[in-house]
Amino acid sequence: MHLVSTVVAALVVAATWAVPVAGAQDCGALWVERNTYYKQAGYCFRTQQAIEYFGNAGCYIYNEAQIQFAPHIRRRLQDIIRMERALRCPR
């Protein structure tokens, strides 16, 4: 089961990477990119929207503060959050 969720997460990431970062400047694309990093890390989503989009199969982290992102991913997440605020995206 963990293998299936890993494969699904990899496919989502690959699809996200296919969109140039500069082009991912709308709220929906930023939401998907941001939450893809959380899915990859094993986060268990709580919102219905995220559960429907990503699912919770294979998740094992319930507290997002416990996620240990690599520095480059942490920086990208900070950039995404800044862009979401600038665009006034819903959270």
Residue ranges and their predicted role:
Residues 9, 41, 81-83:
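Enrichment for repetitive, rod-forming helical segments
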Residues 21-30:
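Cleaved targeting-peptide boundary
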Residues 45, 52-91:
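Compact alpha-helical subdomains of small soluble proteins
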Residues 1-6:
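Positively charged n-region of N-terminal signal peptides that target proteins for export
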Residues 7-8, 13-21:
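C-terminal segment of classical bacterial N-terminal signal peptides
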Residues 29-55, 59:
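Amphipathic alpha-helical packing elements
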Residues 11-14, 28, 70:
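A general, composition-driven signal for non-globular sequence regions
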